[in-house]
């Protein structure tokens, strides 16, 4: 067998192993998110080169939201699809962003059933308001402390 053929087989094996390991790690992270555990998602060094603490909005609870507030200490964002944003009449923060990453921020919101919007309980109430299909635009106040992302 030629040296180049052996080298190609070794490289192919390594690539398959890397892909398998990556699939295994991604599956493990997805399982943790489904269980409501916080995970850190790191973006590319070519982008913001940062990590985001991610939890499932459907599994948000006192423990994992407290964890996020205590250790992440940044903006709390909630990804929302077009249907949610339309139903709740949540507008984009700006029509055309000049943010080089084009992060699709909307106007921040709080549930009207919150006190200041800052506490863990207030943030949980706002998250549940966003997720509740029966919620109406009048159930939210703007601006608030949670940032829906389109």
Residue ranges of predicted features:
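Catalytic domains of riboflavin
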Residues: 2-150
């Amino acid at each position: 067998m030629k040296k180049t053929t052996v080298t190609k087989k070794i490289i192919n094996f390594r690539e398959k192993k890397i892909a398998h390991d990556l699939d295994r790690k991604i599956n493990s992270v997805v399982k943790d998110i489904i269980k409501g555990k916080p995970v850190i998602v790191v973006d590319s060094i070519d982008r913001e080169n940062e990590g985001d603490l991610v939890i499932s909005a459907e599994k948000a609870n006192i423990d994992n939201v407290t964890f996020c507030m205590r250790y992440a200490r940044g903006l709390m964002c909630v990804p929302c699809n077009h249907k949610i944003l339309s139903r709740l009449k949540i507008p984009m923060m700006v029509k055309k962003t000049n943010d080089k990453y084009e992060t699709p921020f909307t106007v921040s919101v709080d549930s009207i059933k919150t006190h200041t919007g800052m506490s863990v309980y207030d943030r949980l109430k706002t998250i549940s308001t966003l997720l509740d299909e029966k919620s109406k635009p009048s159930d939210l106040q703007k601006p608030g402390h949670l940032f829906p992302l389109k």
